[in-house]
Regions:
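N-terminal, charge-rich interaction modules
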Residues: 1-33
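Hydrophobic, Leu/Ile/Phe/Ala-enriched alpha-helical segments that form helix-helix packing faces
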Residues: 30-38, 85-89
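Generic preference for flexible, low-structure residues
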Residues: 2, 25-27, 42, 46, ...
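Generic detection of intrinsically disordered/low-complexity segments and helix-coil linkers/edges
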Residues: 4, 20, 44-47, 73, ...
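Short, compact, well-ordered microdomains
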Residues: 60-104
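Intrinsically disordered, low-complexity boundary segments flanking structured domains
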Residues: 1, 52-54, 79-80
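Short, intrinsically disordered low-complexity segments
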Residues: 28, 36-73
Length: 105
C-alpha cells in the first residue's frame, strides 16, 4: 500500500507478470479522466489540460501516470480511483519524491 507521506506515486504500464499494459494510450486516458481534479476545482476549459495532480509521463521507456498526494487530500475518491485502477489492472507502482532522473529517458 502507498504510505501517507509519499511525495508522488508512479503507476507503471507494466503488469505484475511483466507484460506491457494495453491500450498503449492508457496513461493519457487515465490522466484525461482525472483532468477535472485540480487545485481550485473545475474551471472553464480545464478539461483541455491535465491536472497537475495526475500526469502522464515515461520513466525508462515505460509509460506511467504520476499521482501527486495533494489529490488524496483534496479529492479522496479520485485518489482511490487511481489506486484501484492500478490494483484492478495489476499494474506495478512505486513512490518517489520526484521523477527518478536515473530512470528518465
Amino acid at each position: 500500500m502507498v504510505s501517507s507521506t509519499a511525495k508522488e506515486v508512479f503507476i507503471q504500464g507494466i503488469t505484475r507478470d511483466g507484460k506491457t499494459f494495453r491500450p498503449s494510450d492508457w496513461a493519457e486516458r487515465l490522466a484525461g479522466v482525472m483532468s477535472q481534479f485540480r487545485p481550485g476545482g473545475v474551471r472553464p476549459g480545464s478539461h483541455l489540460s491535465y491536472s497537475p495532480w495526475c500526469l502522464p509521463t515515461s520513466v525508462g521507456g515505460v509509460k506511467c501516470v504520476v499521482v501527486h498526494p495533494d489529490l488524496r487530500a483534496a479529492e479522496p475518491m479520485a485518489w482511490e480511483f487511481c489506486m484501484n485502477f492500478a490494483k484492478d489492472n495489476e499494474l506495478q507502482f512505486f513512490e518517489a519524491w520526484a521523477k527518478p532522473e536515473a530512470l528518465a529517458e
